[in-house]
């Protein structure tokens, strides 16, 4: 079971169930998310921020991979670092509200090069096929995954770095406004039985 890691204090209630957590685009700059991630014994994906600045995401990964001593819930805590902290590319939004994808070959190559120069452990990326990468057009998710698979066939570096995809799906196809209240329909998702890439 995976979870988007919004509130660190909730982790202790779910820790026996979770095998993966993602730190969202709006939380990736938060120092407490980085420190707590360094003490987890499961993979933690760090999304790029909505600005698209990869250096922020990479700094978050570096912090999560390092060991730390910090205060958490009134206790002094020591973490040994999480070598499984990695990138999640989710696209970005410009100051004018335009979506910009970052799953293309050139984007993956740029991330690989940054990993190589930064001395990271276990360079890895999950590609988020929704959010700004799809422009919130959920039916684009399969095409995006196929494009990344194509990039992986043309570069061993990219093939070794890409570990999977984040695909949003739910019981009913399509999306709805929060106030619509249709059971089984998400506010962002693809039908869970839709064909895979």
What are the language-model segments listed below?
Residues 1-8, 192-197:
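Conserved small/polar residues in nucleotide/adenosyl-binding loops
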Residues 3-114, 131-132, 136-147, 151, ...:
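Active-site-facing alpha/beta catalytic cores
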Residues 44, 122-123:
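Residue-level detector of short coil/turn "hinge" positions at structural boundaries
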Residues 119:
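Acidic (Asp/Glu)-rich catalytic clusters
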Residues 123-131, 195:
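Short acidic catalytic loops
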Residues 179-188:
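Acidic, Ser/Thr-rich peripheral helices and adjacent loops at domain boundaries
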């Amino acid at each position: 079971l995976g979870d988007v890691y919004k509130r660190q204090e909730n982790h202790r209630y779910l820790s026996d169930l979770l095998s993966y957590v993602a730190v969202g685009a709006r939380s990736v700059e938060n120092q407490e998310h980085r420190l707590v991630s360094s003490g987890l014994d499961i993979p933690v994906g760090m999304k790029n921020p909505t600005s698209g600045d990869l250096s922020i995401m990479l700094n978050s990964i570096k912090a999560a991979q390092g060991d730390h001593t910090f205060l958490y819930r009134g206790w002094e805590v020591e973490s040994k670092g999480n070598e499984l902290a990695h990138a999640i590319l989710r696209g970005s939004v410009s100051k004018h509200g335009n979506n910009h994808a970052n799953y293309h070959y050139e984007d993956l190559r740029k991330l690989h090069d940054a990993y190589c120069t930064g001395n990271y452990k276990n360079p890895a990326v999950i590609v988020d096929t929704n959010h700004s990468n799809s422009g919130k057009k959920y039916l684009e998710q399969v095409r995006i995954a196929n494009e990344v698979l194509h990039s992986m066939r043309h570069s061993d570096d990219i093939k070794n770095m890409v570990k999977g995809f984040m695909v949003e799906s739910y019981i009913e196809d399509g999306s709805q406004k929060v106030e619509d209240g249709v059971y089984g329909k998400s506010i962002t998702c693809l039908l869970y039985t839709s064909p895979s890439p």
